[in-house]
Regions:
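Extended, solvent-exposed functional surface patches
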Residues: 1-133, 139-140, 144-147, 154-158, ...
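Proline-centered turn/helix-capping motifs that create local helix->coil transitions or kinks
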Residues: 63, 150-151, 182-186, 198-201
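Solenoid-repeat scaffolds in large eukaryotic assemblies
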Residues: 154-157, 184-190
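Solenoid-like repeat scaffolds
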Residues: 158-168, 192-201
Length: 201
């Protein structure tokens, strides 16, 4: 069957002109630009536009990292947002893989923050169902970003794997983390007979 047209060029034009700039939005604007050439032909002019936009996002993210290595949601915030820290760090790692210069000190501070957060993580009481779901997904994503950065936190991964009541999303993300590190057996154990459909939330 034919795949409907999604007008890729128009979608990327929207990203170039996106004007909202919390750290999540800043990262969401730049992240897809790393992969434009996989979806459409890119001439020299557009390649330069992509490069400029990605480099500017990297520069702005540097200014949103606080001394402990985490990233804030808005400039001027005093404390790191754990989800945003994982997301921004993932973008920086992928940008580096695509050949962009990323400050090693920024990445090292980020890794330290991620490792400490991963090691200190504990699942909350199940009475708080939303918090229970959210923190599990957050930890699995954090572990995934560390593995992506070549710094897997194996002990925290193994502890989480044994945690009862993990959500579908957390299981699949943790399985992807194991797969990234080449450990297919625990990855397969996590998702054996696991659901592939996520309920609305």
């Amino acid at each position: 069957s034919r795949i409907p047209s999604v007008d890729i060029s128009r979608r990327f034009d929207y990203l170039y002109n996106y004007q909202h700039h919390c750290t999540e939005q800043l990262t969401s604007k730049a992240l897809p630009l790393l992969f434009v050439s996989q979806f459409k032909a890119v001439d020299e002019e557009e390649a330069q536009k992509i490069k400029t936009n990605v480099q500017e996002a990297i520069r702005q993210l540097y200014a949103r990292q606080i001394p402990n290595g985490g990233f804030v949601y808005w400039p001027g915030n005093a404390s790191a947002d754990e989800w945003i820290t994982s997301y921004a760090g993932m973008f920086l790692i992928l940008a580096q893989e695509k050949g962009y210069a990323v400050n090693s000190n920024v990445l090292n501070k980020w890794k330290r923050f991620q490792r400490a957060a991963a090691q200190n993580w504990r699942m909350p009481d199940q009475d708080d169902s939303w918090g229970y779901w959210q923190t599990g997904v957050q930890q699995a994503y954090r572990l995934y970003t560390l593995a992506l950065a070549g710094a897997p936190e194996q002990g925290a991964m193994n502890r989480m794997k044994e945690q009862a009541g993990l959500s579908i999303q957390a299981k699949w993300r943790l399985a992807a983390t194991y797969a990234l590190t080449g450990k297919m057996k625990p990855a397969e154990e996590l998702v054996y007979n696991a659901e592939t459909t996520v309920s609305p939330y």
